[in-house]
Amino acid sequence: MKSHTEYLVFQTRKRREMVHITDQVEEIVRRSGVKDGLCFVSPMHITAAVYVNDLESGLIEDIEKWLEELAPARPEYKHHRTGEDNGDAHLKSLLLHHETTLPVTGGKLDLGTWQRVFYAEFDGQRRKRVIVKVLGVE
């Protein structure tokens, strides 16, 4: 079994941002040399998420609205007693799911027609890393 690890680095311009990363993950899979296996993608931060969905601007807006309705930015989170102001970012990360595992077939991500990989940042404007680990056979 082969293992290959790389890191993606992001510094979003906004506090909350959805970044399409399918091409970057696909390139890491290609460089890995793995022909059949799994690709694990996970932010190394607890206020971000990686998810799979459609690359359609209306849907992305709907997801952002839904997350804000379920975990609105507000001052009364108990987490804020620590001096932080990002309680909503922690909850949004949980709602969207923290990481994803993707199938690799024939040396490529084996995604459905409309499936795309996204990095979701909820407490941005600083340097963040995402680990991409590819496991499988050559």
Residue ranges and their predicted role:
Residues 1-138:
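Active-site histidine-anchored catalytic micro-motif
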